[in-house]
Amino acid sequence: MLQIAIVGGTGYTGVELIRLLSSHPKVNIKWLTSRSEAGKPVASTFPSLRGISELTYSDLGEDTLSALTQCDVVFFATPHGVAMQQAEALVAAGVKVIDLAADFRLQSLQDFEHWYKHKHACPDLLKQAAYGLPEINREAIKSASVIGNPGCYPTTAILGLKPVIEAQNLASDALIEPRIIIDAKSGVSGAGRQAKLSLNYAETTDNFSAYGVAGHRHLPEIEQGVHVLLQSKFTQNIRFVPHLVPMIRGMFSTIHLGLTEAGCQLDLQAIYEQAYKDEPFIDVLPAGEFPDTRSVRASNRLRIAVHQNNSNKEATILVVQDNLVKGAAGQAVQCMNVMFGFEESLGLNHVPVVP
């Protein structure tokens, strides 16, 4: 039985980790930390966990490091900049680290410091970290000591692009035009649980807004996925615009591709189906169908629809996921399963919630 800790268990990704790991047959949650809720039962903060979890929040204070080194794996569901303060000591003690923030996502120190406004505390460890997207980086995750759990938007974008980029890598000529447009929408839970005027009910209900239009911190992560992890042999110029929509959870990314003459000769539907036929959490819908966010709610599933229009030389890739599960906590548990040699879907076979 793995002994685990969740650092930062009061945010939405933290409570999703508690929900998922409480029913995982191979783990025991040894520590659940929160300075603001220390001493309180988790079920008093989240009544949904009554009868499910008997855990109490702890503020380990000066004993944090010694307590966490008693664990096999530590999940950080904390703001950016927290995990990297503890990661080196934990790894030295043989503890695996899975960070749900951005400390270990970007391999470029320059990109990290530019977009996240932090000086990285352990650049040498960053070089050893694995990007936690199992569908493209499974082998690296298996042997990694540190996982940078992907951002929610990059998960949809990279997995939405993977089959066509890989097909293009095998072709002599480009299959898609250099310009890629990603139009993405997220429920408000993606902005976190903290109180903000822009996130209150009166501001978000019956409202729909774009943000990060001039530049969003997930853009370099998407670019890294395409050009480094997928090793695109053609340069792709990515335009990414996220939006906040009036729903609690869910994410819908629409990816617009221009097709070349060579690209129009291919059956993208067949390419996507073949690419993901063995992936337990990726569902490529039949031709002509459309995904919706409700179909993946509270699950670790990601659904893709491919729409190819050769007469207009274009393709539209539609991708949906739950931003808190496949876009965050579920993916972290999936990575843990890969790291420790468990069945990848263990503890994650939850049926999506409808309605």
From Swiss-Prot:
The compartments listed are: Cytoplasm
Recorded hits in Pfam families, A to Z, give: Semialdhyde_dh, Semialdhyde_dhC_1
List the catalytic activities from the record: N-acetyl-L-glutamate 5-semialdehyde + phosphate + NADP(+) = N-acetyl-L-glutamyl 5-phosphate + NADPH + H(+)
EC number(s) given by UniProt: 1.2.1.38
The record's section on CDD domains has:
AGPR_1_C, AGPR_1_N
> Highest taxon of the source?
Bacteria
UniProt xrefs under SUPFAM superfamilies: Glyceraldehyde-3-phosphate dehydrogenase-like, C-terminal domain, NAD(P)-binding Rossmann-fold domains
Biological process, per Gene Ontology: L-arginine biosynthetic process
Q: Which residues form the active site?
A: C152
- Tell me where it mainly resides: cytoplasm
List S-S links within the chain.
none
Provide the alphabetized UniProt keywords: Amino-acid biosynthesis, Arginine biosynthesis, Cytoplasm, NADP, Oxidoreductase
- Signal peptide range equals none
Where does this protein act, in terms of pathway? Amino-acid biosynthesis; L-arginine biosynthesis; N(2)-acetyl-L-ornithine from L-glutamate: step 3/4
Residues crossing the lipid bilayer are none
An example Gene Ontology cellular component term from the record?
cytoplasm
What InterPro entries does the record point to?
AGPR_AS (IPR023013), AGPR_type-1 (IPR000706), NAD(P)-bd_dom_sf (IPR036291), NAGSA_dehydrogenase (IPR050085), Semialdehyde_DH_NAD-bd (IPR000534)
Tell me the GO molecular function terms.
N-acetyl-gamma-glutamyl-phosphate reductase activity; NAD binding; NADP+ binding
Q: What does this protein do?
A: Catalyzes the NADPH-dependent reduction of N-acetyl-5-glutamyl phosphate to yield N-acetyl-L-glutamate 5-semialdehyde.
HAMAP family per the record?
ArgC_type1 (MF_00150)
Q: Which PANTHER family match?
A: N-ACETYL-GAMMA-GLUTAMYL-PHOSPHATE REDUCTASE, CHLOROPLASTIC-RELATED, N-ACETYL-GAMMA-GLUTAMYL-PHOSPHATE REDUCTASE, CHLOROPLASTIC-RELATED-RELATED
| Family statement | Belongs to the NAGSA dehydrogenase family. Type 1 subfamily.
Q: What is this protein called?
A: N-acetyl-gamma-glutamyl-phosphate reductase
Record gene name = argC
